[in-house]
Amino acid sequence: FSGIINWISNIKNKFFRKILEIVAGIDKRVQLPKYNSETFSNFFRKNNKKINYESNKSDRKVVIYSTCFVNFNKKNTGVAALKVLKKNGVEVQEAYPGCCGMPFLEQADLPKVVQQAKKVSKDLLNWIDKGYKVVTLTASCGLMLKFEWPLLLPEDENIKKLSTNVMDIDEYVVDISNNEGLVEGLQEID
């Protein structure tokens, strides 16, 4: 199915892009994101145990919050994050309980953002209660979990707890580098 959508939405497909422009108002010159043939969540379920490295196990545990963009459009970002984390001895799980609500925030649909915050936080809190940190792979989603949700639900203790246990993937890898150091084969970029 993703192959058909990608073919129709390809900027070189002038016929269907003209139809998209007329029907949906999507400018035919705009390059639309491609869809993965497999979600990152499905990839993780099938491949997580197969990805093993001879590295020291650490006490670190994370749950990757896949995000809509990585799950449906940029699976390779999730695969790369999974490999880097596992290479550094981190126990990795994955969760995608739904969208963080950023698209709804952009449309000023605050009730829908609150609904998503409550739904997603409920699932992610289960991981936090098991000792996991939540790692986001898309900066805007990390922003929602860490800063926007607490602004919308300032009295919600679950949202507060979640917001203090979320890190962006780059922030988390820098934390590993600063504390334990990165394993051989991984190095800082100047």
Please give the residue ranges for each predicted region.
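Iron-sulfur cluster-binding electron-transfer modules in prokaryotic oxidoreductases
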Residues: 1-190
